[in-house]
Regions:
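Charged, amphipathic alpha-helical coiled-coil/dimerization segments
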Residues: 3-6, 82-140
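N-terminal helix-turn-helix DNA-binding core of bacterial DNA-binding proteins
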Residues: 30-75
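N-terminal positioning helix adjacent to the helix-turn-helix/winged-helix DNA-binding module
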Residues: 17, 45-47, 109, 137
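Short, hydrophobic-biased segments on the C-terminal half of alpha helices
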Residues: 63, 81-82
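Alpha-helical linker/hinge and terminal dimerization helices associated
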Residues: 28, 32-35, 70, 113-132, ...
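C-terminal regulatory/oligomerization modules of transcriptional regulators
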Residues: 1-12, 135-157
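N-terminal leader segment of winged-helix/HTH proteins
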Residues: 1-40
Length: 157
């Protein structure tokens, strides 16, 4: 699709807005991924897992909940957790007597990796995203994206 308007055109089509959103989010993710690899030695998917665990109560999550929060398929999550377990960043443990339910638990080493990577990630986000728009625009984006995300989370795909 070829753009026929400027970003200030009030009647941009949903397709044009989607294209801008999609391209920007892909570009920003690539920049964050590159910075994490260069400065921390790991990638954005691993950072996403570390973030979910670092923000969880007791630094642990049930694997199903971790997959939901990171938007990973169970097989992709399992592969990534295996990589991270080898680095000593986390452990996968059975939950009590239920051998079918497993948790991922963040280790001190994993928390340290997260804390240094969070600084790198936030620097890129500030430079390429938050620092480029007004607080009013950021608030509007949050309202729109939160509403859309909430709808998707309720929808079974």
């Amino acid at each position: 699709m070829v753009r026929t308007d400027s970003p200030d055109t009030p009647d941009a089509t949903p397709e044009e807005i989607w294209e801008d959103f999609f391209k920007f989010s892909q570009m920003l993710n690539l920049e964050i991924d590159y910075a994490l690899k260069e400065q921390c030695g790991f990638d954005l998917p691993q950072y996403s897992i570390l973030t979910a665990l670092a923000n969880a109560p007791e630094k642990k999550l049930q694997l199903g909940e971790l997959a939901r929060q990171t938007v990973f398929s169970p097989s992709r999550l399992n592969y990534r957790l295996g990589e991270m377990e080898k680095k000593g960043w986390l452990n996968r443990l059975c939950q009590g007597s239920d051998k079918r339910t497993r948790n991922a638990c963040l280790s001190t080493k994993g928390l340290n990796a997260y804390e240094s990577a969070a600084q790198v990630q936030m620097k890129v986000v500030r430079e390429l995203f938050a620092g480029r728009v007004s607080q009013s625009d950021l608030n509007a984006m949050r309202r729109v994206l939160s509403s859309m995300r909430s709808h998707l989370e309720k929808t079974e795909l």
